[in-house]
Design a protein with these regions (language model features):
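Hydrophobic alpha-helical transmembrane segments of multi-pass integral membrane proteins
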Residues: 1-181
Length: 181
């Protein structure tokens, strides 16, 4: 209900959470009959028959990707721009990633998830599983590219340096940054 009532512009995080919420309800409804029949059966650990893709992609996948669309740019913004606030023009958090790539990865990931869930429920032929899987993989690759470009374009660290803790590689003027101890 709060997502519908919100007054701010929808971001990639909001769009993914808007998929997560009904996917979670749908997964619960699909799983309920199996859990009522045999609540401790190992084959029902992750829900009823045909609900695995809905749980893995519709619930967990959209929740994780939506959260990463907020956390990664936020951490970069706090590290790079927060101390400049009020002294110079700084970008908004949502300006750090590419909106077009975010829209593309959302469409690909959603389309792939819908195809996989529909194939699981026998609403589409089994061949749709391959198509759906391909769309999910492509959407995941576009998301990863968007986040890696965000890190590359706005962080003083190289991609490897951010992971392994190397000193910053470049400053705005192209010189190697000095490490503050």
């Amino acid at each position: 209900r709060k997502l519908v009532e919100m007054r701010v512009e929808w971001t990639p995080m909001h769009r993914r959470y808007a998929v997560f919420a009904p996917a979670l309800v749908g997964w619960g409804l699909l799983s309920l009959p199996a859990w009522l029949r045999a609540p401790t059966a190992p084959e029902h650990l992750f829900g009823g028959a045909g609900s695995a893709h809905l749980l893995a992609l519709g619930v967990v996948g959209f929740l994780v990707v939506g959260t990463l669309y907020h956390v990664i740019p936020f951490l970069i913004w706090v590290n790079q721009y927060s101390d400049r606030l009020g002294f110079e023009s700084v970008p908004m958090i949502d300006d750090l990633y590419d909106d077009r790539l975010a829209a593309a990865d959302f469409a690909l990931f959603l389309g792939g998830t819908v195809a996989l869930v529909a194939a699981d429920m026998s609403l589409l032929p089994a061949a749709a599983t391959g198509l759906g899987g391909g769309l999910v993989v492509l959407g995941s690759a576009v998301f990863a590219a968007n986040m890696l470009l965000t890190i590359r374009n706005h962080s003083p660290y190289s991609l490897a340096g951010g992971v392994f803790g190397s000193p910053p590689e470049r400053e705005e003027n192209g010189d190697r940054a000095e490490v503050q101890e």
